[in-house]
Every structure is written in C-alpha cells, then in structure tokens.
Regions:
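Nuclease-adjacent, charged terminal/linker segments that flank catalytic cores
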Residues: 1-122, 126-127
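Short, flexible loop/turn elements at secondary-structure junctions
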Residues: 54, 65, 188, 200-202
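Hydrophobic, Leu/Ile/Phe/Ala-enriched alpha-helical segments that form helix-helix packing faces
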Residues: 65, 76-80, 109, 143-151, ...
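Flexible, glycine- and charge-enriched loops at secondary-structure boundaries
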Residues: 69-72, 133, 205-209
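Short histidine-centered catalytic/ligand-binding loop motif
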Residues: 128, 197-199
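Active-site metal-binding core of divalent-cation-utilizing nuclease and nuclease-like domains
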Residues: 132, 137, 141-146, 154-194, ...
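Catalytic cores of nucleic-acid endonucleases
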Residues: 200-222
C-alpha cells in the first residue's frame, strides 16, 4: 500500500474523522458549587442521555446523581414541564416509565455537543423508540456511563474510558458501510477503541462462542 493510499484511508476512516467528535462529548456528572449549578448540570446531562440513548429513566438518574427515587422523578418531571422530555408509561421499564426527548431537547443537545442531531418527533411519544429494547438500552446506558463514573475505594477518580459512541450514533456513522453493528464503542485511556456488546438474555457457551467468532471475523476484515 502506498503512502497516498494510507493517507486516503486515514482521512476517510470514521475512526479518525467522525468518532472523535462523539468521544469528546463530556458525559461526566459534576455536582456544581451550588444548588443552581447542580440543577443546570443535571438538566444538561439528562438531556444528553435521552438524546444519545433515545430514553432516560428515574433509575438511571437516581444512580448517576446519587439521589432517591422521589427526587429523580421530580427532576425528570421538571424537564418534562420545561418541554425537554415526554413521559411514556410502560411495564417494560423497571420504573414503569421512560422519558423520551423532544425537538426542543434535540436543539439543546446540538448546542451542547456541537453535533447535528438526527431527530424525528412523533405525536405519540411511545413510537419514538422500540419498547422491546428498553432493558437492553438501559443496561447499555448504565455500562457506558459507569465506565465514565468509575472510582477507587478511596474515591480517587479512575475512569475505564474517556468517551463513548452509542448504538444509534454508531449506526448513523456506518450507515453505508458493511461494518457489523455493535451496541457502542468506547475510547480507552490509551486512545485505543473498543466495542461494547450488551447481552442480557441467556445464551450458552456455544452460542456466545459463535457470536464472538463472527465479531473476530469482522475485525480481521476491517
């Protein structure tokens, strides 16, 4: 391969051109110096979670912000009142509900990220996402956010990765390629990129081996 061909591949490889923009989105929660700043920081992060993962729930923000269920509901209901979220009641969520972003939230997220948001609003908010994937999406969101918010036992900040790309973002980036879809990708602290695959349904060892071998084959082709 010539140096010109190598340069072409690098300049047209999403790993070098598109992924960094998403990896650089700040998804770490910082409480803030006062209650006002705390509220602003929570509002921004909750909107980003809803936009990037399609949904957000009281369970996610309760864990992330270290608050109880009542305060988590108050926080999300306030964002709903402000026109940033809409609530959908569903038994598929551990909280009995999920919150989906609005067009206003999409425009707000664009300002925060500096990235265009591909958003389609629907009069019926329950049609904005696949209810069969609620648990999968919530587990995915927890895992990716957990890696950003990792601490040692002495409270020393020790993130497992510095940023991530969600499944919807990954699909949009690789829309016209034959890249195998993953549940997300993370940028590790050494700058390397790792794929995230969430499997919350039971599969025996043989089934898991088949899946992993398919991923290995895809990696060797890329």
């Amino acid at each position: 391969m010539t140096s010109q061909q190598t340069k072409y591949l690098e300049t047209n490889n999403p790993l070098h051109t598109l992924y960094p923009r998403f990896f650089d989105i700040d998804m770490r929660y910082c409480a803030g110096a006062n209650n006002h700043q705390k509220g602003v920081n929570r509002a921004k992060l909750s909107v980003l979670i809803a936009i990037r993962f399609s949904i957000v729930t009281p369970g996610i923000v309760r864990w992330l912000y270290g608050i109880n269920h009542r305060l988590a509901l108050e926080h999300l209901n306030r964002l709903e009142k402000d026109g940033l979220l809409r609530v959908v009641k569903t038994h598929r969520s551990p909280d009995g509900r999920v919150y989906v972003p609005t067009y206003t939230a999409a425009k707000f997220a664009e300002e925060l990220m500096g990235i265009d948001v591909h958003f389609r609003s629907n009069k019926n908010p329950s049609l904005q996402f696949n209810q069969n994937n609620i648990m999968h999406n919530l587990i995915n969101a927890f895992v990716m956010l957990r890696g950003i918010h990792n601490y040692h036992s002495d409270e020393t900040y020790a993130p497992m990765w510095s940023g991530f790309i969600t499944e919807p973002e990954f699909k949009r980036i690789n829309n016209l390629s034959d890249t195998r879809t993953v549940d997300g990708a993370v940028r590790l602290l050494d700058g390397s990129v790792a794929a995230i695959e969430i499997e919350h349904s039971f599969k025996n060892k043989t089934a898991r081996q088949v899946i992993l071998l398919k991923y290995l084959a895809s990696l060797k082709k890329s």
